Swiss-Prot record:
Residues 141-374 form the Radical SAM core domain. This is tRNA-2-methylthio-N(6)-dimethylallyladenosine synthase. It comes from Acidovorax sp. (strain JS42). Binds 2 [4Fe-4S] clusters. One cluster is coordinated with 3 cysteines and an exchangeable S-adenosyl-L-methionine. InterPro entries: Elp3/MiaA/NifB-like_rSAM, Methylthiotransferase, Methylthiotransferase_CS, Methylthiotransferase_N, Methylthiotransferase_N_sf, MiaB_methiolase, rSAM, rSAM_horseshoe. Monomer. Belongs to the methylthiotransferase family. MiaB subfamily. It comes from the Bacteria.
Length: 448
């Protein structure tokens, strides 16, 4: 009987990718099979996020919920950014944890588990062996028509509020050829859409063979687009400072590059952006968007926003609201500032009452939601090209797919359509999703 591993993932798409790789490593080395039920697991892993305090504390709450399973001999591990940040402190706070490992050492999981058994004590490895992780991962195994591919790790921007450079290290790019080989392997398995991942993905500079030359992100996109079977290319997350003219021009040269971009701005006040050490102004950010939309008028934009950064005044907040109106974002991830230990912003004086921050967050989200609904309503009556991803989460009798602009569409259809690119006419708009019906025959397809 095979051993079972339960993996709970917190945070970003990079963590989702890493969780898949944990399962692959454990399956290849020790025969583990994934399970969705922690009660059936022989090994429970938490792949953690430390971007906000709430996410970090939830990890320890969840650890408490599975502690009783130790009586059955279940092994428990903590990986990801909380593991990287806290290290041995996790063992002190939760001594029943067996292994602690960082994002860069997940490939060593089998070794850590073997050492735990041999030495009868918890094992911790939160080192930064740079790109070694990718050299020791088994070939990607996927189910479905879309897949993530990590092309780089870490971030070297050191924004004043962010823990990523401390938990994932500085920027390290995978070799150019390695990325192309992985994408080609996924295409051979039927993948039609790839999402290229990195904390600062557009800073990619990958080694090209034994030469001193480096491939930038725009060149990588061109080569990925040439791989047979790949029909759509997405990427996340990008930094405004790295959005070069070459990358903007890629949207004119590469039709497979989708008309959707997640480009975190974080704020709309130049004073706050400077305090955040973001390295650009609101005007420079909007200039990048204007250039992109000159090439792709239908470009859908999403962003991250931090409300209540230390020293944020009502005037600063209104500047952020103006930027939101000017850009007309299609989606956002918005949060109240959460001071992270060890970052410069954690030491800044903050005298804004929490109720003021909460009111601002609610006001911001209300405007974003209004924009999202308006954009959704504009799609009604158009025909959208979808990649059908699976059964609808809203209604098990329907299917769901995603438009080029990253909008989910639910529609009635046969399961044989899963994994296919199809045309769907939009019949109804909701704030975050659309409803539609499959188009039969030849119909002019709108991009969306």
């Amino acid at each position: 009987m095979s051993k079972k591993v339960f993996i709970k993932t917190f945070g970003c798409q990079m963590n989702e990718y890493d969780s898949d790789k944990m399962a692959d490593v454990l399956g290849a080395a020790q025969g583990y099979e994934p399970t969705d039920d922690p009660e059936q697991a022989d090994l429970i892993l938490f792949n953690t996020c430390s971007v906000r305090e709430k996410a970090q504390e939830k990890v320890f709450s969840d650890l408490g919920r599975v502690k009783h399973l130790k009586d059955k001999g279940v092994l428990i591990g903590v990986g990801g950014c909380v593991a990287s940040q806290e290290g041995e402190e996790i063992i002190k706070r939760a001594p029943f944890v067996d292994v602690v490992f960082g994002p860069q050492t997940l490939h060593r999981l089998p070794e850590l588990l073997n050492a735990r058994a041999a030495k009868a004590r918890p094992q911790v490895d939160i080192s930064f062996p740079e790109i070694e992780k990718f050299d020791h991962l088994p070939p990607a195994r996927v189910e479905g028509a879309s897949a993530f591919v990590s092309i780089m790790e870490g971030c070297s921007k050191y924004c004043s509020y962010c823990v990523v450079p401390y938990t994932r290290g500085e920027e390290v790019s995978r070799p150019f050829e390695d990325v192309l080989v992985e994408v080609a392997g996924l295409a051979d398995q039927g993948v039609k859409e790839v999402t290229l991942l990195g904390q600062n993905v557009n800073a990619y500079l990958g080694a090209m063979g034994d030469t001193a030359e480096k491939a930038d992100f725009a060149l990588l996109l061109e080569y990925v687009a040439e791989i047979p079977g790949i029909e759509r290319i997405r990427f996340t997350t990008s930094h405004p400072n790295e959005f070069t003219p070459r990358l903007i021009e890629a949207y004119a040269k590469i039709p497979k590059l989708v008309s959707h971009l997640h480009l975190p701005v974080q704020h709309g006040s130049d004073r706050i952006l400077m305090a955040m050490k973001r390295g650009y102004t609101a005007m420079e950010y909007k200039s990048t968007i204007r250039k992109l939309r000159a090439i792709r008028p239908d470009m859908a934009m999403s962003s991250d926003f931090i409300v209540g950064f230390p020293g944020e005044t009502e005037e600063d907040f209104q500047k952020m609201m103006k930027l939101i109106d000017d850009v007309r974002f299609d989606n956002s991830f918005s949060f109240i500032f959460s001071p992270r230990p060890g970052t410069p912003a954690a030491n800044l004086h903050d005298d804004t009452p929490h109720e003021v921050k909460l009111r601002r967050l609610q006001e911001l989200q209300a405007v974003i939601n209004r924009n999202i609904l308006e954009i959704s309503q504009e799609r009604v009556g158009t025909v959208q090209r979808l990649l059908v991803e699976g059964v609808s989460k809203r209604d098990g009798s329907e299917l769901m797919g995603r438009t080029e602009c990253n909008r989910v569409v639910n529609f009635p259809g046969h399961e044989r359509l899963i994994g296919q690119m199809i045309d769907v006419k939009i019949t109804e708009a909701r704030t975050y999703t659309l409803r539609g019906e499959v188009v039969m025959g030849e119909v002019t397809t709108a991009v969306g």
